Amino acid sequence: ELTATLNAAMKMGFNKVWAIFQPHTFSRTAMLLDDFAEALKIPDQAIISAILPVRETNTYNIYSTDLGAKVPGSVCLDTFEEITDYVCKNAKEGDLILTMGGGNVYMCANMIYKQLKYMEENK
């Protein structure tokens, strides 16, 4: 799903495609680390949030930075606030910003929208 979505997005003619990805569970991230890394090399910019643990503890000793290390140019940020600030400072008109993952990463979309709207209204 990740690969198919990102490949399709890259063909849509946007200036730049951003993928904000929230890994879901430590076990799944450990098992699919290389697959996630290959998919996250597709967009122009990948932002990786902290792993959403759900009910797990990190017995796998895996972190978002492990995934980020496999994706050249990616940025690992722990909080949605940090992600929002980074995107709002760096994204440009004509860019596509996707939120992807099995958790609450969708909340970033609304946060980014609100911050960009505020920035536009207070130029």
Task: Enumerate the predicted regions with their spans.
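ATP-dependent carboxylate-amine ligase
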Residues: E1-K123
